[in-house]
Amino acid sequence: MARRPARCYRYCKNKPYPKSRYNRAVPDSKIRIFDLGRKRAGVDEFPLCIHLVSNEYEQITSEALEAARICANKYLVKIGGKDSFHLRVRAHPFHVVRINKMLSCAGADRLQTGMRHAFGKPNGLVARVNIGQVLMSVRTKDSSRATAIEALRRCQYKFPGQQRIIVSKKWGFSQYARDEYIEKRSRGEIIPDGCYAKFLNKRGSLQEKLDLFPEASFNLA
């Protein structure tokens, strides 16, 4: 039987129905990789962050997320190189959609019950997204701004509904605005923590601060 079109599952009509002990035999999600590019790049290397944001309350299939991931990654690698960006898919498919298979051959009425017992069996996974929810994010250098915007624009053709591209005011994937990040980084109030930044407050034990700054223990000695 052919795959049912995604337009049949576009709207959020029912409650969330995740995989569980009473919802078994769920097929695997088509998207298995959510981070691509230079994932281990420090927070200082990629200051620019661009988001693809949903404008609708809808469901997006795992096949569409995988198609968008491949589309964006291929364009970014082709134009900027594989080490020039960090792409992250922010929507995760957890909602299970069902299908009540119907036979269309001769004598089908003898083999099936029609709309009686029509609950259906698990058929795939979709992500339930809200208005304003981020679907994909790219952090890169300021020189690659046009490339990242074009990559996310191409991803819009893989999704139903409407989306918009937003250039974030934050520094990369961190929670700090760009001006705030530069100021606090120069004063030593935040330190890099992978692709994020950690704020150093003035509270806490002395041992905790020494663990963050091992070189300070030599000054105490």
From Swiss-Prot:
Keywords of the record: Cytoplasm, Ribonucleoprotein, Ribosomal protein
Self-association state and partner proteins as the record states: Component of the large ribosomal subunit (LSU). Mature yeast ribosomes consist of a small (40S) and a large (60S) subunit. The 40S small subunit contains 1 molecule of ribosomal RNA (18S rRNA) and at least 33 different proteins. The large 60S subunit contains 3 rRNA molecules (25S, 5.8S and 5S rRNA) and at least 46 different proteins.
A single MF term (Gene Ontology): structural constituent of ribosome
Superkingdom assignment: Eukaryota
GO terms classed as biological process: cytoplasmic translation; ribosome biogenesis; translation
One of the record's GO cellular component terms: cytosol
Subcellular location: Cytoplasm
Additional facts recorded: There are 2 genes for uL16 in S.pombe.
Function summary: Component of the ribosome, a large ribonucleoprotein complex responsible for the synthesis of proteins in the cell. The small ribosomal subunit (SSU) binds messenger RNAs (mRNAs) and translates the encoded message by selecting cognate aminoacyl-transfer RNA (tRNA) molecules. The large subunit (LSU) contains the ribosomal catalytic site termed the peptidyl transferase center (PTC), which catalyzes the formation of peptide bonds, thereby polymerizing the amino acids delivered by tRNAs into a polypeptide chain.
Family membership: Belongs to the universal ribosomal protein uL16 family.
Pfam family, one: Ribosomal_L16
The protein's name in its UniProt record: Large ribosomal subunit protein uL16B
